[in-house]
Amino acid sequence: YAKNRVQFGKPIASFQAIQHHCANMLLYVEGSRHITYKTACLMDEGRSSKIRIATAKGWVSEAYKRVIALGHQVGGGAAIMTEHDLTLYSRRAKAAEVAFGDAAYHRMVVASSLGIHE
């Protein structure tokens, strides 16, 4: 979208703020992918722990929300239209939060596992 949307005579992807948002989205996605694969690999080997799993779930949950928010900022008004997939991703993120717990819940699980949460 950022490459195709033109504002002030040039694609919005040429603006530094948009570039930073897109770069941050990539960092969140790649970080989530890494921690998910690492945790899955450790689980497959039987070397995972409750803390590692909760950490991965918490990171991915928070990253998903941030990527959605940045996507809405990059997309502007178009991002809230049902014709764009971002609205579907927003609904899925909320449903996943309800079904699997949000980042705050998973931070609480980590703290409890460390013995620092009541």
Q: Predicted segment positions?
A:
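Alpha-helical interface subdomain recognition
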Residues: 1-118
